Amino acid sequence: VTAALGTLALLLATLAALGGAAALLRGQVAGRPALVALGERAPAAVFAFVTTAVAALEAALLRPDFSVAYVADNVSSGTPLLFRAIALWGALEGSILLWAWLHAGFTALVAWRYRGRYPATVPLALAVLLGIGAFFLLLMLGPADPFAPAVPVPADGRGLNPLLRNHPLMAVHPPFLYLGYVGLAVPYAFAMAALLSRTLRDEWAAVTRRWTMAAWAFLTTGIVLGAWWSYEVLGWGGYWAWDPVENAALLPWLAVTAFLHSAIVQERRRLLRLWNCALVILAFLLTLFGTFLTRSGILASVHAFTVSLIGPLFLLFIAAVLAFSLAVLLLRRDQVRDEGALPAYLSRETLFLLNNVLLLVLVATVFLGTVFPLVVEAVA
């Protein structure tokens, strides 16, 4: 019954996300406020349905119900209660569910926070957020099903990965990282919506500043907690051991740090418009890249899950997001032209840009160093 409830909730959440995005887009393009109003209710429905799915999986983990394959693979009758609860994000399917839940929460907060405000922009931003959420929900209706049945049903489960039950930081480190990752979808969605609607040309950066700062703070906390944890486990080598997944967490942090500095220049001087849009797109794409590395299993890492079928799907999604973002920039290239030029050398704005360049050099260095083994393997 628990598994059936969870699966039904995920199906309804997917339908609500896809239907809401379609209603928002259709209503905005056709000028039909009733459709837009209907679509703006979708984020709350999606969050409610995904919350139901999370509650169903948590109930199965706490019981524990070994008829659910995820439960049988990640807890046992001897697993302490705390680690049964946090096993929700201890493996592939549960981590995707956590991501979808947090994303649904952010989307619902955006819908609530900006209800009735920026009517030309917010519906499009919500449509982008719902579309992103729909991808993760569809994964769970396919290759990453957290409610798949265990066949045959074992008498006891395998228990959580020993590396994950050695420290209580398992309870907070992954959620903070995920909050940082998911939070970066908000400035990305607003940047795309501002370009498409030709509104909030410079204001979108200010409107999303708190969301960006929150995502940066969550990501920073997650990285610091992970660094602390890495020194508690023999064989992990501490932080930073050039682990691909550690690199993948650092990449969006560097990109969003650069954006937080350069956004000030856009807000005050109406400069770096294209640069800031590119930084937001890059930061969001890097969160997807990090998720791909962790969940595809293509690189050896103490953090990575086993090889799964969702790796190619993530690559396709990353390619789709990149293509969509570039198309929007090309379509609205007049919107990202600067008004004037940067002031003289050694001005505050020029120093901010230099800071950005240094951070992006770090991004390029870490990224190339991370994917280099894949390139060598492909060539070989």
What are these regions (language model features)?
Residues 1-380:
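Polytopic transmembrane helical bundles with strong interfacial aromatic enrichment
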